């Protein structure tokens, strides 16, 4: 079962990465520039994938400085040397700024040190400066070799043998300031740190009715400031790419006082450290504080987050991203020829792609140039689709126009939560309500799912009613698993009574089934002939039509955090294996991705049937592992992966078979996976996807205006989801064919392609399908 079969032409040969296919190669891995959480996950993936394909992998300590100094700074890595680093922030191989490498003499020394170990493949994890340096090194390589030969430091054979240097980059930077990739390694973790601080500050600010000015990192890039402002519903944000208009001081003070007048007890202003005005003059946090104090007299505090943002444990997203990129980097090095340019492994949507390194660097420099020349619209455009989308969404949600400036549509749009609670649902409701009001609709909230709908628990909901909802976990509207099927008459009556013109459903598989039932009931009940759209929100991530659902990232972080703690407990005890049961129904997403993020030895899932022989081989594998220095094991099991191989059965089997070698413990994570404050990813995903759903509803209602049109076509009842690189609306009627209704999962799931990754990184042999990687793409500037 492969989610990407469609990409390989029918009848084409699938391409697999074979074990030991890189024998004889030597790869050097280094981290350079400012550190970022997740760099260790990338180093681990490069080392283990390199060893798996039979290459020698060398650590280059302290970045380019270590390459120039040589000696013990370049050391061969083995499997165990990258154990227990997945959950550690920063970089275990060190990073340093290096002046020597900027000179030709320095690069000559570096080339000599690499040649002594036969290293002609470099994997560089760092920012644009580090990657530019690597590219220059690659260009000069043949000249450096000739110079070394002239100096008698190497012989002519070596010049022939090591004629080419291959370079692959991964972007490790918390600022997300590199063009060509949606997310850089470390950005998501930095957002976690910022949001933890904002959530903590909110409670104290509310107690004292204070205004807080938070300064976040980003000298030349406002990504962290923008996304954290979106994730916490900040009152105002200052970015280098989009400076405030002339007279912003007065506008900001008006906005803050309006919010106070609406009984909001706190104001949050987020400032990127590189914030500027339209004349390129810096806007500092102190300047903003003075302004608020003198103009409004509010009790105002400044908090500068500083290096806290670089620290702490990497988030699940960063671990998975870095692991995928590390593996892709090794494949890119194996496939590199003298003609391929240095490339960067990056993320586009949900897809790992390779881009020419210098194209990305050039575009990144173009952004800075545009800002220097005060071409701010160009700067936003060059930052890419994701940045521009975030900025647009923030503006729509933060600033409410006066009522007399909003054209009224006389349409009522209802929002409902269905299924089990998922973190991020409230962010989605807030976004829908505010976008709907800004579009001129009257917004209605339906409480307690379809059950509440049938009973008429429906109330109008206003702009300020949803203030502060973004960071709240669970479902404030209330949610139930009840399907509408048995209440169709009552729901139709409520639709008529409240004259509901469109419906937005936020929920999991029950929401999807409910949408199908409402669709089927259109013939009988004309009340259901209105635009309906569903936004997937469930920890299980099992809704057809979308690669991701709201809540899954928060659950994944909960699982990963718990696994980290459990691994620590196992390390202290020595020779202990933990069996952990995750949620997800029949969908193995949480078990599989949790396994990848936590560094598990195995993950049992329903989608990949297993038998007693597989369990036996896992036990043998763990028995071998206990002979090494890593004397602990971690096994994840999806709650419904097998009727008979239950968590208890697997625990008992492992306990018996491991007697005398290791002991075993089990842990069922349960409902803690549904709770907690939403992660930054879920807050923003919920906010953005829900805003898109409302835009679709508005467009549909516009089509029908004045004609009292009934919506009966399939394309008026859709699921909105992310698929590969696009946000798409898919009619539920079409999704039926793609659904396994018995097990409540889509028939094809993209993440199954990452199954072999987890196995390879846990020292199993597995064939990894690389059919759709390897094409070098080009950076496309995005047009606003």
Curated annotation (Swiss-Prot):
Pfam families xref list: PFK
Keywords: Acetylation, Allosteric enzyme, ATP-binding, Cytoplasm, Glycolysis, Glycoprotein, Kinase, Magnesium, Metal-binding, Nucleotide-binding, Phosphoprotein, Transferase
Binding locations of beta-D-fructose 2,6-bisphosphate: 481, 538-542, 576, 583-585, 639, 665, 671-674, 744
Residues found modified as N-acetylmethionine: 1
Region (C-terminal regulatory PFK domain 2): 412-784
Residues that bear Phosphoserine: 6, 12, 21, 142, 386, 783
Post-translational modification: Phosphorylation at Ser-386 promotes interaction with ATG4B.
Region described as N-terminal catalytic PFK domain 1: spans on this chain: 1-399
GO molecular function ontology, one term from the record: protein-containing complex binding
Pathway: Carbohydrate degradation; glycolysis; D-glyceraldehyde 3-phosphate and glycerone phosphate from D-glucose: step 3/4
Entry binding sites for substrate: 173-175, 210, 217-219, 273, 301, 307-310
Catalytic activity: beta-D-fructose 6-phosphate + ATP = beta-D-fructose 1,6-bisphosphate + ADP + H(+)
Protein function: Catalyzes the phosphorylation of D-fructose 6-phosphate to fructose 1,6-bisphosphate by ATP, the first committing step of glycolysis.
Name of the protein in its database record: ATP-dependent 6-phosphofructokinase, platelet type
Annotated organism of origin: Homo sapiens (Human)
């Amino acid at each position: 079962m492969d989610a990407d079969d469609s990409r390989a032409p029918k009848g084409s040969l699938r391409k697999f990465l074979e074990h030991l296919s890189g024998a004889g190669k030597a790869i050097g891995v280094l981290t350079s520039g400012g550190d970022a959480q997740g760099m260790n996950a990338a180093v681990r993936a490069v080392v283990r994938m390199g060893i798996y394909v039979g290459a020698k992998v060398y650590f280059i300590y302290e970045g380019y400085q270590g390459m120039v100094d040589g000696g013990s700074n370049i050391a061969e890595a083995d499997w165990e040397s990258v154990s227990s680093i997945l959950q550690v922030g920063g970089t275990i191989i060190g990073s340093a700024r290096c002046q020597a490498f900027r000179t030709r003499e320095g690069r000559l020394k570096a080339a000599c040190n690499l040649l002594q170990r036969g290293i002609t493949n470099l994997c560089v994890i760092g920012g644009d400066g580090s990657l530019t340096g690597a590219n220059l090194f690659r260009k000069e390589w043949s000249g450096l070799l000739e110079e070394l030969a002239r100096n008698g430091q190497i012989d002519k054979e070596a010049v022939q043998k090591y004629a080419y240097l291959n370079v692959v980059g991964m972007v490790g930077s918390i600022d997300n300031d590199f063009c060509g990739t949606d997310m850089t390694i470390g950005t998501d973790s930095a957002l976690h740190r910022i949001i933890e601080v904002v959530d903590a500050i909110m409670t104290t600010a509310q107690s004292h009715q204070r205004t807080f000015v938070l300064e976040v990192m980003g000298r030349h890039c406002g990504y962290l400031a923008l996304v954290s402002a979106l994730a916490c519903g900040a009152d105002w944000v200052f970015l280098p790419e989009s400076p405030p208009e002339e007279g912003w001081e007065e506008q900001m003070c008006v906005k803050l006082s309006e919010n106070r007048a609406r009984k909001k007890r706190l104001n949050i202003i987020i400032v990127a450290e590189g914030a500027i005005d339209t004349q390129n003059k810096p806007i500092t946090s102190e300047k903003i504080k003075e302004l608020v104090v003198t103009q409004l007299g509010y009790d105002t505090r400044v908090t500068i987050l500083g290096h806290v943002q670089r620290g702490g444990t990497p988030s699940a997203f960063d671990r998975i991203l870095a692991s995928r990129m590390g593996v892709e980097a090794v494949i890119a090095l194996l496939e590199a020829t003298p003609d391929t340019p240095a490339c960067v492994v990056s993320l586009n949507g949900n897809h790992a792609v390779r881009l020419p390194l210098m194209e990305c660097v050039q575009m990144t420099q173009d952004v800075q140039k545009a800002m220097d020349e005060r071409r701010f619209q160009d700067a936003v455009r060059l930052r890419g689709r994701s940045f521009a989308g975030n900025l647009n969404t923030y503006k729509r949600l933060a600033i409410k126009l006066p009522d007399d400036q909003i054209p009224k549509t006389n349409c009522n749009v209802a929002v409902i939560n269905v299924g089990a609670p998922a973190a991020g649902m409230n962010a989605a409701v807030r976004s829908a309500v505010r976008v709907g009001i800004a579009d001129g609709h009257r917004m209605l909230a339906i409480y307690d799912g379809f059950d509440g709908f049938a009973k008429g628990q429906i109330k109008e909901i206003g702009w300020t009613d949803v203030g502060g909802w973004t960071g709240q976990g669970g479902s404030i509207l209330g949610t139930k698993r009840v399907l509408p099927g048995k209440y169709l008459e009552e729901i139709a009556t409520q639709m008529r009574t409240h004259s509901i013109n469109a419906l937005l459903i936020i929920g999991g598989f029950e929401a999807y089934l409910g949408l199908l039932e409402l669709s089927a009931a259109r013939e009988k009940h004309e009340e259901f002939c209105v635009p309906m759209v569903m936004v997937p929100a469930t920890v299980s991530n099992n809704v057809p039509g979308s690669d991701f659902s709201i809540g899954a990232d928060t659950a994944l972080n909960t699982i990963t955090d718990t696994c980290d703690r459990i691994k620590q407990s196992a390390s202290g005890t020595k020779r202990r294996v933990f069996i952990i049961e995750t949620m997800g129904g029949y969908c193995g997403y949480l078990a599989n991705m949790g396994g990848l993020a936590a560094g598990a030895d195995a993950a049992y899932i329903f989608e990949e049937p297993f038998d007693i022989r597989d369990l036996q081989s896992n036990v043998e594998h763990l028995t071998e592992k206990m002979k090494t220095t890593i004397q602990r094991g971690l096994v994840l099991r999806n709650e419904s992966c097998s009727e008979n191989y239950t968590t208890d059965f697997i625990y008992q089997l492992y306990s018996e078979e491991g007697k005398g070698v290791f002991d075993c413990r089990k842990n069922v994570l349960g409902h803690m996976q549904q709770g907690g404050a939403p992660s930054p990813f879920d807050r923003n995903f919920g906010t953005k996807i829900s805003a898109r759903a409302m835009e679709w509803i508005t467009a549909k209602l516009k089509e029908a205006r004045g004609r009292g049109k009934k919506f009966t076509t399939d394309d008026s009842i859709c699921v909105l989801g992310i698929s590969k690189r696009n946000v798409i609306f898919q009619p539920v009627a079409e999704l039926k064919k793609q659904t396994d209704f018995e097990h409540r999962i889509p028939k094809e799931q993209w993440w199954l392609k990452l199954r072999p990754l987890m196995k390879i990184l846990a020292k199993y042999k597995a064939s990894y399908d690389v059919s759709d990687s390897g094409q070098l793409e080009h950076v496309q500037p995005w047009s606003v």
